[in-house]
């Protein structure tokens, strides 16, 4: 009897579309979309503890904004997933934003390793996975060969995991943003989930390794320093002008 009265609860962390497809409870926070994307700031950071719904919020942003690559500017998918939510009541905002922007969404939650080399490879794998979603741009007649070459490189996991190619990793967001602007004529929205994880993990491992190798005078704790250099280059796009429509980051 009770099972017919209540919806199921989500059993594990899920993205917005997965949650909607599951028929589970969903607390309508779609009005946050307008709050965030009409804010005067072009870079916003949300800091909350784990399990506070940051990832769900970011995937909701992505689902609402992203252009349908098969039918650009068609909003039928958004109308499906956001049916019955408050944001659809704001027709003017939806007309301007819903399904109208290319979106780059990346989570850095898995960037970890006991050594910098291991963490670098995880970082490269994460970026390559995201870049591979945009390989359809290789068939575009709007991109030149240099732009297509950049996408091919950052989509190639074996190539990107080699540290001698770290400049491609550092510039991967610029490569994607430039290609998406060329394709759609709109600067993309950048969503970075758990932006602080790589540096937090690097700091932890440096502290641990200092204790572990305290008697080894040749040991140098440079994991965190190397990660700072990598992150600085990767996030460099946030300082560029006329590259992104808006950037949203989450972290603890």
Language-model segments: residues:
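Phosphate-binding site recognition
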Residues: 1-252
